[in-house]
C-alpha cells in the first residue's frame, strides 16, 4: 500500500491544475510553493502573466528575488508552464 503522504501532494497538485485560472488560485499556489514564512511576509497579485509580490521589507524582497527561479519552477508545476511569466518583487 502507498502511504497517503506520498499520494496527497500529487492529488492536490492535480486538483489545483484542473481548477479555473484565477488570481485567487495563483495566490493559493504562491502560498503553497513559498511556505509559511515567505507567505506571511508577502502579498501577491497576478495579471497578464506577471506575479506582483509586495514584500514587507528589503530583506524579504531579496529573499524572494534570490529564490525566484525555484519559485517559478514550482509555480509552473502547480499552475502550468508560463502562467507566471515574470515575478516582479517590490518592498514597502
Language-model segment annotations:
Residues 35-40:
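Short amphipathic beta-strand starts and helix->beta connectors
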Amino acid at each position: 500500500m502507498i502511504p497517503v503522504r506520498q499520494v496527497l501532494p500529487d492529488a492536490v497538485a492535480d486538483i489545483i491544475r484542473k481548477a479555473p485560472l484565477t488570481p485567487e488560485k495563483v495566490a493559493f499556489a504562491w502560498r503553497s510553493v513559498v511556505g509559511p514564512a515567505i507567505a506571511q511576509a508577502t502579498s501577491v497579485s497576478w495579471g497578464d502573466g506577471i506575479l506582483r509580490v509586495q514584500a514587507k521589507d528589503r530583506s524579504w524582497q531579496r529573499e524572494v528575488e534570490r529564490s525566484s527561479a525555484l519559485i517559478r519552477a514550482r509555480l509552473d508545476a502547480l499552475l502550468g508552464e508560463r502562467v507566471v511569466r515574470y515575478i516582479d518583487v517590490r518592498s514597502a
